[in-house]
């Protein structure tokens, strides 16, 4: 019996690794989440091992050897930094704010301040570093032996680093691998790694560079043409709008799109997810499923938890209104539909409540973890199954479930 051809798509998060097997047309055969050991993920000398071990555990969970793997594509959060020396690692996670630098700097780079944190607070680690990678870049290195820095699009260079700025802060560019573009083929999976996945060591499986999770999520929701909107939530929540020019208004953040000449404008709600989780963890719902908790709150509107979700939903409504106001200046669209991704997209009760409060149509795609679909789109574009990321996204991203206001 012929095996189904799939891309093995990986996204490295802060507390877990997500993975899925996705076909050329966007069908998700299987998916899994591997939680990192809470003890190891807090140890900077073990974090990178957590990623590596979780990758192989995900492969085992998905039974990847039962499929014909045609590609692997990896994304992850940033700016996480992993120093590598003699096969030993030290990782400074993107959200580790336990340290500071003597003289804070003004820069557009999100990486240089983190590099300086590493340099000033861990001088011995810094001096012994052979090279420094992000999370996905480290896993790519482990699988292929290739050292790369993934630049999502040329306009992102200010958010990364330029040689002049590295010189100014006495950071050796030899520590930082050369830039490669999104989708770059880093190499093939080493035979010993294939064997750990119960795949023949002679098989040639290319590993493609997915890059930052924010970028792959925008690709995986097809937020790639002017007027498209997606709502990406986790500990924070970002409402994203694809535009043809930056929007210079208070509260809006502008970044390049992966589509040349386009931009992504986002309106950020910094702590919506965190606030709800903090309440949940301090209540009798601490160890119970999110969906059961939301269902209870919707039936018990006098509960403190309901007041929190009602407050959050109204903040989201206000953010949607701000984004839609800008969308209407860009397009003539009347039928507004917003694609939602992240943990929220897997919770039907929350999605319906959100639709009721915002009075908008909300969509969940065939892959609610949009980062994984973004990786599949990148892989299939590089495999020449599609002529561009945009063409692949148009075919592979499908609205699987629509939530319409009922109240």
Regions found by a protein language model. Name each.
Residues 22-23, 82-85, 118-119, 141-144, ...:
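Short beta-strand-to-turn element immediately C-terminal to the catalytic PLP-Schiff-base lysine
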Residues 1-34, 39, 70, 74-103, ...:
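Glycine/Thr-rich phosphate-binding loops that ligate phosphate moieties of nucleotide
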Residues 104-116, 196-201, 228-230, 381-396:
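A polyampholytic, Gly/Pro-enriched intrinsically disordered region
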Residues 12-14, 106-204, 208-212:
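Gly/Ser/Thr-rich active-site cleft segment
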Residues 5-11, 68-75, 91-92, 132, ...:
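Short glycine-aspartate micro-motif
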Residues 48-62, 161-165, 315-322:
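Short, well-ordered amphipathic alpha-helical segments that serve as non-catalytic structural scaffolds
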Residues 220-226, 378-383:
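Alpha-helix C-terminal capping segments
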Residues 30-67, 102-107:
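N-terminal phosphate-binding loop and adjacent alpha-helix
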């Amino acid at each position: 019996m012929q095996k189904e051809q799939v891309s093995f798509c990986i996204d490295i998060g802060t507390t877990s690794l997500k993975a899925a097997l996705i076909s050329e047309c966007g069908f998700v055969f299987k998916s899994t989440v591997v939680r990192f050991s809470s003890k190891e993920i807090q140890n900077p000398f073990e974090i990178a091992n957590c990623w590596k071990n979780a990758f192989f555990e995900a492969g085992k969970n998905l039974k990847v050897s039962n499929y014909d793997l045609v590609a692997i594509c990896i994304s992850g959060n940033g700016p996480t930094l992993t120093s590598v020396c003699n096969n030993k690692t030290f990782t400074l996670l993107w959200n580790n704010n336990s340290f500071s630098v003597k003289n804070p700097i003004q820069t557009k780079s999100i990486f240089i301040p983190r590099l300086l944190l590493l340099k000033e607070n861990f001088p011995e680690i810094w001096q012994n570093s052979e090279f420094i990678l992000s999370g996905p870049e480290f896993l790519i290195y482990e699988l292929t032996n290739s050292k790369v820095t993934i630049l999502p699009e040329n306009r992102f260079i200010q958010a990364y680093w330029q040689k002049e700025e590295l010189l100014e802060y006495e950071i050796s560019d030899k520590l930082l691998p050369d830039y490669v573009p999104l989708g770059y083929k880093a190499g093939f999976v080493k035979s010993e790694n294939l064997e750990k996945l119960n795949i023949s060591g002679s098989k040639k499986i290319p590993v493609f560079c997915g890059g930052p999770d924010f970028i792959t999520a925008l690709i995986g929701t097809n937020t790639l043409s002017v007027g498209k909107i997606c709502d990406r939530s986790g500990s924070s929540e970002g409402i994203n709008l694809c535009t043809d020019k930056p929007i210079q208004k208070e509260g809006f953040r502008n970044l390049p799109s992966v589509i040349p000449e386009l931009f992504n404008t986002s309106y950020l709600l910094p702590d919506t997810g965190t606030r709800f989780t903090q309440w949940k963890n301090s209540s009798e719902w601490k160890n119970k499923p999110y969906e059961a908790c939301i269902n209870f709150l919707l039936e018990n509107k006098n509960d403190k938890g309901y007041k929190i979700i009602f407050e959050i939903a109204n903040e989201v409504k206000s953010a949607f209104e701000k984004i839609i106001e800008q969308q209407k200046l860009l397009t003539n669209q009347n039928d507004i539909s917003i694609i939602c991704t992240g943990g929220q997209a897997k919770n039907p009760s929350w999605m319906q409540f959100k639709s009721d409060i915002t009075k908008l149509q909300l969509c969940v795609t065939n892959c609610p973890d949009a980062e994984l679909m973004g990786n599949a789109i990148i892989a299939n574009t590089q495999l020449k199954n599609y002529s561009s990321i945009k063409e692949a996204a148009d075919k592979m991203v499908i609205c699987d479930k629509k939530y319409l206001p009922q109240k």
